Amino acid sequence: MIDQNVTKSEDNKFKILQAAKWYSPEVGGIETVAVAITDAVRDKAEMKILVCSGNKGKETGYTDEGVYIYRAKTPFRICSTPISFDYLGAFRKMSKDVDLIQLHAPFPLSDLALFLGRRSRKIKKALWYHSDVIKQRKLMFFYRPLLKWMLRKVDKIYVASRSIAEQSKYLGKHMDKVEVIPFGISTREYDKAERFPILTEALNDKNNVKILFVGRLVYYKGIDVLIEAMAKTSGAELFVIGGGELDESLKKRTDELGITDKIHFMGRIEKEELLAAFSDCDFFVLPSVNRAECFGLVQLEAMVYGKPVINTSLPTAVPEVSVHGETGLTVEPSNIDELAEAMNLLISDEELRKSYGINARKRCEDSFSMSKMQEKLYASYLELLGKK
């Protein structure tokens, strides 16, 4: 049941409803952005959050920071999209008397909720556009009209890089609404996290270099390419953190290649263990294979610990985050041999890893500051609401 008190607010604070698919402790780039948005306005505005119930089993209630989250009952999914009548009803109730609705795309359920809600034009609507829908082409037949309607109705569209807007099939007519706000990362949060040798302790050969992958085990992440490339490397072990639909097939392929001693499937782990893994690895690999990977925020989580990154030359912001020859290496998507060559180079050259790692940390501090991201977003909100 929705807490009726969440509609009350201090007179000097504007009120925001953030509607997303998932929220922390669910792990992912979009979830990280949703938390960053909350943190940007938490002390200056009243934020309430509507999401679907996720895999972590968290209940509706308040966060430690006092932010109200309603986790709608989600009985099933179609094409990875949650279906929830509870979400639609909660959106209508929670959007009452707010000043601003913050949405995320692509997410058909929240778009439908906005369409059915038909709230006053006085309520400003902002959208964080993460990427086009890439895989579920059949879904787009039904979703496209709703997405186009929603893009017309929102007052502001945020993207993490100009390339996301320029490569999109749907944002071209709405560039006047687009504002670029690069994702940020809080170096302070990562610096104060406990560090322990979570990967080192699991090594089969203590002399091996530790390679890390973190992400959902889904098609566009390119984890299958990474597994194949690992068969062409020596002197290293790969740690795979995350779960997803490809879990069993990846383990089977690892067994077929005879490299089970080189690959550790760790599944989903707690946040403190995840941060320890980033700090303990020697380098990070993001082998994504198509535009569904629009930014690769996870790269920053490795870079903040001074770790070099191998990424792919996608026509998105991915290679703009970690720069080839400066903070790591960039290879062609789906190119097993090129990926293996890049990994072998970093495996064999400790000094190169150190040099890239130093540059990676500096790039985080200079170009991807969480405080700068949040300041820019809050200023945009004030302008949108006519308070600036």
Label each region the model flagged:
Residues 279-294, 307:
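Acidic donor-binding loop of glycosyltransferase active sites
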Residues 251-269:
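Nucleotide-activated donor-binding/catalytic signature segment of Leloir-type glycosyltransferases, i.e.
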Residues 57, 86, 100-122, 127-129, ...:
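An aromatic- and histidine-rich active-site surface loop
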Residues 32, 36, 209-232, 236, ...:
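A conserved mid-protein helix/loop that constitutes part of the nucleotide-sugar donor-binding site
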Residues 268-269, 276-281:
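Short alpha-helical donor nucleotide-sugar binding micro-motif in glycosyltransferases
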Residues 323-325, 329-336, 343-351:
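Conserved acidic donor-binding segment of nucleotide-sugar-dependent glycosyltransferases
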Residues 152-190:
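A short, active-site helix/loop in glycosyltransferases that binds the activated sugar's phosphate group
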Residues 308-312, 322:
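Short hydrophobic beta-strand element within catalytic cores of glycosyltransferases
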